[in-house]
Amino acid sequence: MIPNPVRAVIIDDSLLVRNIISDQIQKDSKIHVVATGKTGMDCIDLAQKMNPDVIILDVEMPVMDGLTALHELQKKKLGIPVIMLSVLTQNGAEATFKALEYGAIDFVPKPSSVFQFDPEEIGNILKSKILAYFESKIQIPSQNLLKKAPAYSKVPAGSHLKKSPIQAICIGTSTGGPRALQEVFSRIPADISLPILVVQHMPAGFTKAFATRLNDHAKIKVKEAEDGEPIEPNTGYVAPGDAHLSIQSKGGRKWIALNREAPVNGHRPSIEVLLDSAIEEYKSGIIGVIMTGMGKDGSAAIVRVREIGGSTIAQDEQTSVIYGMNRQAVEMGGVEYIEPVTEIINRIQIILKERGI
């Protein structure tokens, strides 16, 4: 059941930021700010005294920073979801990914100066993330318990469609994705012999550090995708924030193509753009994976992947921070297999044995 209202605590060392966020998110009657604080110590104290439904926590603060406070909260096993506020710097990005490893459900970037703040924008982002998180917790479709999802009506089980060998793996994810992708990439074998193209909804300024972090945990090379570079096997390519990632053929090879055209489904990069480009270039020779995240980006394209004879996988509800995009894909009939995050690579390897490379 969604708390009504959702009781929020805001922790930031700037009084102005606390007031801005408090005023903005309470414009929605479903959210009520019950307390605010300015240090990590305040965070721990208010979490225990107020037992809020959600905490909005700044990364960088005096006395005790947000990372330390988050780590302490996790040790106390209070089970309160935390959304981090992170400045758009290299240090801020690295601290943010560490916070996600510690258990934060998501993050929202903020400018380094309060004078650059767009109060309405940051308020809308926080409201949507908070409400999407709680709404996802009351949706329990029966399919999520199945390993093999129901066949899509246009592509019945045992379809006559010719399924060609797999040439690429495409993964789309949003809220909860950084931690889930780290889990997936840590399990990819060094000799996977395929390129892996990733769209993670993430602001510009964070994706390069994120790709580096994935690379540190993976046996294959992982990098932020660059426009015009050749697509190589045993390499993961992460779409840059604020750029669509697509594929183009030239001289008998596949190449990365980035563009800054209009957002699709409210996102740039968009999972839909990547999957539709992969369908055009690889036809049925793709595995499409849709993972944790709010919204519907990629769900319609996953249906098209399955229609053309590609293989499709969704992360299950139990291991998703938000069962949103993947839920949409399942309900639309676009998903062939539903797996916990720890089993996605196992399923991919089974598909590769069945279909070849």
UniProtKB/Swiss-Prot annotation:
Domain CheB-type methylesterase: 162-344
Highest taxon in the source lineage: Bacteria
Record's GO cellular component terms: cytoplasm
Major localization class: cytoplasm
Entry's Gene Ontology BP terms: chemotaxis
EC category: hydrolase
Catalyzed reactions per annotation: [protein]-L-glutamate 5-O-methyl ester + H2O = L-glutamyl-[protein] + methanol + H(+); L-glutaminyl-[protein] + H2O = L-glutamyl-[protein] + NH4(+)
Compartment(s) where it occurs, according to its Swiss-Prot or TrEMBL record: Cytoplasm
Entry keyword annotation includes Cell membrane: no
Keywords: Chemotaxis, Cytoplasm, Hydrolase, Phosphoprotein
Pfam families to which the protein is assigned, alphabetical: CheB_methylest, Response_reg
Active site: S174, H201, D297
PANTHER family in the cross-refs: PROTEIN-GLUTAMATE METHYLESTERASE/PROTEIN-GLUTAMINE GLUTAMINASE, PROTEIN-GLUTAMATE METHYLESTERASE_PROTEIN-GLUTAMINE GLUTAMINASE 1
Function according to Swiss-Prot or TrEMBL: Involved in chemotaxis. Part of a chemotaxis signal transduction system that modulates chemotaxis in response to various stimuli. Catalyzes the demethylation of specific methylglutamate residues introduced into the chemoreceptors (methyl-accepting chemotaxis proteins or MCP) by CheR. Also mediates the irreversible deamidation of specific glutamine residues to glutamic acid.
Classification via HAMAP family: CheB_chemtxs
Record family assignment: Belongs to the CheB family.
The record's note on its domains: Contains a C-terminal catalytic domain, and an N-terminal region which modulates catalytic activity.
Protein name, as recorded: Protein-glutamate methylesterase/protein-glutamine glutaminase 1
Organism: Leptospira interrogans serogroup Icterohaemorrhagiae serovar Lai (strain 56601)
Gene behind this protein: cheB1
